[in-house]
Amino acid sequence: MFFHKKRNVNGFLLLDKPKGMTSNNVLQKVKIIFKAKKAGYIGTLDPLATGILPICFGEATKFSNYLNASDKHYNVIARLGEKTSTSDSDGIIVRKRPILFTPIQLSLALKALTGSVNQIPSMYSAVKYKGIPLYKYARQGINVKRNIRCVFIYKIDLVDQKDNWIELNVHCSKGTYIRTLIEDLGEKLFCGAHVIRLRRLKIGLLSYSKLVKLSFLENLLNEKNVVKINFFKKIDDLLMPVDTPVYFLPKIYISIEKLSVFRLGQKVNFSSSITNGLVRVFEKDNNTFIGLGKINSEKTLIPYRLVSMLTN
């Protein structure tokens, strides 16, 4: 048996969520493997879905909201002619209709679902009502009135469509429900539709090229491997930097002299071409991430969101 006290893990992991697990179940497994004191995930994926599930450890959780607000990219395969209770293949079929649309009608339907779109979250979603996820009400047969959400669909690419299935690539804003999008498409085509496969490919500029599979982590935890390798070094090497969620912000360096004052929450003078904006602040000598600062028009750097000392 492998035992270890909980650690102060700091970093960011791009996990490839497996099918059939909730996002929270995946998080708890990863947290146990890393023996991490603090961890969270960004952007809930349905049990049926796979793909990018960002995991933030320790100090990285302070910046998760920036990545959560980013655009998302999905690949989805849907079955046409059938509407289900959950808008995906996990539910029961509630209605069947013939598939009679033409290529032109499909093109028009996809165009109508592009741009600013109003969606009503599915009852089988993680949206909370009075602190309880909607899917828990749905399982008890309780229907809750949901507020309309306005989302933005930047692009829908038709990958393929044959017989009773269709494959799409979707680029959308935060908060978009792909199941709802597919169900709405089915209604516009007068045949119904539900998701049978969903994979998240990208969040912001972070793509699946750096994904780590849960099965890979579990294999490393195998008792024989734990004995043979420096286990924690191996898994910690998979982590991306703490500032990954704010990678899009400009990067600046401050001297160690100014750093001592800055860490105490005091503003420091800083000459820069950047004005009135957030920046990533690094210590000049060793390239250590300090946190976020805000530069104003008076060439002053003000502490905005700082990290604690990054030690394990």
Curated annotation (Swiss-Prot):
Source organism superkingdom: Bacteria
Listed binding positions for substrate are: 74, 177, 198
Q: Which UniProt keywords apply?
A: Isomerase, tRNA processing
E.C. number, please?
Answer: 5.4.99.25
Q: Pfam families recorded for this chain?
A: TruB-C_2, TruB_C_2, TruB_N
Molecular function per GO: RNA binding; tRNA pseudouridine(55) synthase activity
**Its Gene Ontology biological processes?**
mRNA pseudouridine synthesis; tRNA pseudouridine synthesis
Xref: SUPFAM superfamilies? Pseudouridine synthase, PUA domain-like
Catalytic residues? 46 (nucleophile)
Enzymatic reactions? uridine(55) in tRNA = pseudouridine(55) in tRNA
This molecule's function is given as:
Responsible for synthesis of pseudouridine from uracil-55 in the psi GC loop of transfer RNAs.
**PANTHER family linked:** PSEUDOURIDYLATE SYNTHASE TRUB1 (PTHR13767:SF2), TRNA-PSEUDOURIDINE SYNTHASE (PTHR13767)
The UniProt family comment states: Belongs to the pseudouridine synthase TruB family. Type 1 subfamily.
Q: What is this protein called?
A: tRNA pseudouridine synthase B
What is the scientific name of the source organism?
Answer: Buchnera aphidicola subsp. Schizaphis graminum (strain Sg)
